Structures are given as structure tokens and as C-alpha cells.
């Protein structure tokens, strides 16, 4: 299976038998949730639907189906995919049953908050109806990936915690690390990430995921030793940015710049993390690598270590899925950094210049950027 094939098939009549069988069509049309409550998901701005993943699937929906979502205020999303992960490209809508989520989520992947875009308010409802059976099955199968939260399933603490030093371009060795969260233990990785960071001498943490209130909540409910993390937090060496997933949005960039200014003011080594150390961390680390002169290959290789750590997806053992992730996930990050349109070519892209422009566009000065680069490169 090639990358082009996997995505080209989505728009073709891959399953003609579904359209030619009246009995099957009748069965499909009966698959619906009926009206269910829409719930604001404030972190990323999507809309939870008041139905669990298990309940939703028991109605007859399957990953890879095409569905229609109609909200009670009249806003409608037609012919969108239902996946168990964020497998659409940036700014494309989907219904997602992300492992560990309490409910089904309707959102715009890495885009503007659907709740606001759709004009939703408390008390609104949504109805999900099957549009076409398994229309998006090719993408679902290519990108389907889940992970466990059991340390014994992974080769090392570093793999389990998705912990590693950042590399590429002129980045200095041992100055910046990245990982899963060392404080939010919902995925059982926090103790391992914290221990590894402490052993590497981390002095400042850029927390992309949390608010200060959420960090305080983790302290109050911690089931492991949080002394090291709290010692940094208490002296102002943890910056909580509470980023959403829309790295093309102004709010994301403004908050990120505020955090990068904190790096300028504090000595390293530094740790950058979100919850999994995958999406928000993936973008921010690629941006900083680009700023320090990293090539496309260096940024991609670092980004894709995460998919090997969590899912065993790597170029050697699973090239088709590796290429699919690069196409859907990393290449959009590369385009954003380079200032290339969403579906534009990356040929000849200047990532260092693009990274600078990304930051100056939201008010970071050239002097500040140069100081940041000095911190990251020890030059």
C-alpha cells in the first residue's frame, strides 16, 4: 500500500456494493444516535456528545464510516469520517473516539474551535447519522494506532515516557529534552518522565498542556513523589501555557511566545512536554529545531520517534504507515513552519526563516529570537 493509494481511495467508489444493495442501504439509514446533548470540550474547543464510545459503536457505527452530524441550531457537518484517532489533515472535521476519552468528540482537527465555529451553546443537541459505510476505511486502517499505559509493554523507561534529548541543526547536546507529562499521570508516565528529567538535570519546564490550576490539582491528587516538580514550580521554573492543538491559530502562537520568553530568562537544561509529548510537543520542538537550523529530515526523524515509541511505527518495519503519518501529521507541521499553504509543496522550503517569521508575526523580536537561539545552542 502506498501513501498515494491510501488517500486516493478515500474519494473513490471503493465499496460499490454498499450503494447497489437496497437492503444494506435501509440498514445504514437506520443507524443514528437520535438527539443527544452536545457538551463543550474547553481544552481544544470541540464538542463532546453525551454518549460513550462503546454506546456509540453498539449502535452500528464503525471506525472508517462516513457520518453526518446535525446540531439543533441548524449547523451541519456532512460526509465526515469517524476514526479512533485524529487522522484527518489540519482544518478538516471528524468524529473521533480517542482511546481514554469519556465521550465521542466532534471537532476540527488542529483548527478553530468547532464549538465557536458552529455557534453552539449549552443545551444544544446533536444527531449523528451514518452517511456511508466504511467510506474512510483505507485511512482508518493505515493510521489506526493505539498504545498501552503499562510500563512492561515498552523496552525502556525512555521509550515509555517518550523521553529524549532534542537534536538537529545547531542544537547543543543535553540542553533541551522532550517527553510525556512529568506531572499529569493519566497515562501512568509521569513518574518515569519526572525521574528521567531530574536525572538529566532539568532546571526549567515548558508545560504546553496545563494551566496553573491544573498543576495544583495534580499536586493535590498525586499518587507518586512530586517533590522535584514542585520544587521547580515553587521558584517559578515551570511555565504553564495551556495550548490548544491549533498551531496555525493566533492564540496558540501568542501563548507559545510567552513561554519561549521564559526560556530566555531561565537557565537550562529545559524540558518541553504536553500530555503525551506527541502533538503540541511535536510542533514546538520542530519549530525550535528549525530555528536552530535543522533540516526537514532531522525534524521529521525526531518527530517520528514518538510514533515508534508509542505505536512501533517506523520506516524500517512499517513503511506504509510511517509514510501515512508523515503525510497527514508531520508535513503539515513542516508547511506551517515554512509558511507554505496547507497543500503546498515543501520543495526549497527555508525552515529557519519560516520559524523566525512564525514568531515575529506574533510580536517576538529578532533580539529575543537570537537570545532564544543562544540558549538552545550554547552559542
Predicted region positions:
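Cys-dependent protein tyrosine phosphatase-like superfamily
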Residues: 15-25, 110-112, 116-270, 284-379
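Ser/Thr-glycine-rich phosphate-binding loops at phosphate-binding pockets of nucleotides
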Residues: 276, 280-281
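Active-site cradle of extracellular carbohydrate-active enzymes
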Residues: 271, 275
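Long, compositionally biased stretches
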Residues: 21-110, 114-129
Amino acid at each position: 500500500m502506498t501513501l498515494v493509494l491510501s488517500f486516493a481511495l478515500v474519494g473513490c467508489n471503493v465499496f460499490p456494493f454498499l450503494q447497489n444493495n437496497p437492503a444494506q442501504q435501509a440498514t445504514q439509514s437506520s443507524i443514528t444516535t437520535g438527539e443527544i446533548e452536545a457538551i463543550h470540550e474547553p481544552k481544544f474547543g470541540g464538542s463532546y456528545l453525551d454518549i460513550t464510545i462503546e454506546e456509540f459503536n453498539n449502535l452500528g457505527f464503525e471506525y472508517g464510516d462516513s457520518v453526518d452530524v446535525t446540531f439543533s441550531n441548524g449547523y451541519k457537518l456532512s460526509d465526515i469520517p469517524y476514526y479512533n484517532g485524529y487522522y484527518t489533515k489540519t482544518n478538516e472535521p471528524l468524529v473521533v473516539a480517542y482511546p481514554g476519552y469519556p465521550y465521542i468528540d466532534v471537532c476540527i482537527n488542529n483548527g478553530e474551535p468547532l464549538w465557536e465555529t458552529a455557534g453552539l451553546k449549552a443545551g444544544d443537541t446533536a444527531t449523528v447519522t451514518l452517511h456511508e459505510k466504511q467510506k474512510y476505511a483505507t485511512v482508518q486502517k493505515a493510521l489506526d494506532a493505539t498504545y498501552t499505559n503499562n510500563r512492561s509493554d515498552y523496552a525502556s523507561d525512555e521509550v515509555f515516557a517518550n523521553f529524549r534529548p532534542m537534536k538537529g541543526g545547531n542544537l547543543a547536546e543535553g540542553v533541551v529534552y522532550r517527553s510525556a507529562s512529568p506531572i499529569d499521570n493519566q497515562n501512568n508516565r509521569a513518574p518515569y518522565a519526572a525521574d528521567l528529567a531530574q536525572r538529566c538535570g532539568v532546571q526549567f519546564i515548558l508545560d504546553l498542556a496545563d494551566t496553573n490550576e491544573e498543576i495544583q490539582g495534580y499536586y493535590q491528587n498525586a499518587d507518586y513523589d512530586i517533590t522535584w516538580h514542585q520544587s521547580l514550580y515553587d521558584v517559578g521554573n515551570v511555565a504553564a501555557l495551556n495550548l490548544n492543538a491549533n498551531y496555525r491559530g493566533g492564540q496558540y502562537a501568542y501563548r507559545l511566545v510567552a513561554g519561549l520568553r521564559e526560556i530566555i530568562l531561565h537557565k537550562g537544561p529545559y524540558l518541553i512536554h504536553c500530555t503525551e509529548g506527541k502533538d503540541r510537543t511535536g510542533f514546538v520542538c520542530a519549530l525550535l529545531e528549525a530555528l536552530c537550523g535543522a533540516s526537514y529530515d532531522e525534524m521529521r526523524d525526531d518527530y517520528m520517534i514518538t510514533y515508534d515509541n508509542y505505536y512501533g511505527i517506523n520506516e524500517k518495519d512499517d513503511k506504509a504507515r510511517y509514510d501515512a503519518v508523515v503525510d497527514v501529521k508531520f508535513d503539515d507541521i513542516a508547511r506551517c513552519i515554512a509558511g507554505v499553504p496547507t497543500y503546498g509543496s515543501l520543495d526549497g522550503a527555508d525552515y529557519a526563516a519560516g520559524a523566525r517569521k512564525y514568531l515575529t508575526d506574533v510580536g517576538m523580536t529578532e533580539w529575543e529570537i537570537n537570545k532564544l537561539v543562544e540558549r538552545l545552542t550554547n552559542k
